[in-house]
Amino acid sequence: MLRQNRGAGAIAADVMTGVRPEAETGNSVPTAIAVTSADLVLPPTDQQTPTAALLQAPDVQALEMAIGDMHVLLEQHGYVVAVYPTGISPAHERRLYSVRSVLESDRIALVKVDLPPLGVAVLVRQLRQLSICDFSPGVVASAARLLTHYIHAGALLHSVTKFDRVPVDLRTHAKSWVPGSQFAVVAGPEPQLVRVGPKADPPTGPEFATHLMTAKGQSQSEWVKETLAPAWQVQSIHESALPSESPAWWGTGKLVEFAAYLPDISVLYQLVSSVRRENCRWCRMELIGDRCGFCSSPLPAAEHRMHTAGVLSHEALAPPQS
């Protein structure tokens, strides 16, 4: 580890002039995945899935220490993909950019994700799984945007009076004042909001087989497990602690957050592999999709080709027949 009395300038000089780590000399070292909150790190799915590094907020860690921690990650892994939600504080987001600026490193990707907190945690774990595959750091970073389209993230809410992430009409707002009212909201990939009731259909779910992650707040409702999960034909249900940012994100603490996702690393690998790879014209990093995960430079439209059709289906993830 770095000694605490080393200045930020000395650390930055090490990054710019020092010998690059094993990840860039031919040996296999996973790309580091980093997060801005510890509760975005779900338990690993297997013994091979690495954990994620924590990039702490400015009110918790001094800038020089944050620079030192990032320098260690770069030394150990070569590249860092930092994933953070849209809901973090402006000061925390500025800290991420400050650290990258001081280090003057082109090996740090800052990936901002517009998903609810539990959805972000699910995405982070998928990236952790992919980090040990034979994908370049650029592909891992740009895979985040691809995978968000395959995470159906939402919540069961007891009120939508303070919820502003999905358009809510006045009639629905009025109904939320009725005692016992509950609403099922899907924030992405396609926004949906329905009032929960005996005759109401659940929101439209994924057209491929998934697992379902749930996290309870101050709600004891079993609707997600008893109604939504069967309707979405999920293969397995898992429970997690509610992320600390979830009540603020959803506008209420009386909720059950959920996220349907692809659990199988082989399917994730196939999905990412099915997309055409390009080299960023600006930083030369490898990428998939329409934007570089490291420098955010867009790919010219004529070069953006997706080839994911036919990769996913309920049958593709169905459990083997005994």
Region annotations inferred by a language model:
Residues 1-223:
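Domain-scale terminal segments
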Residues 214-322:
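Cys/His-clustered metal-coordination modules, chiefly Zn-binding fingers
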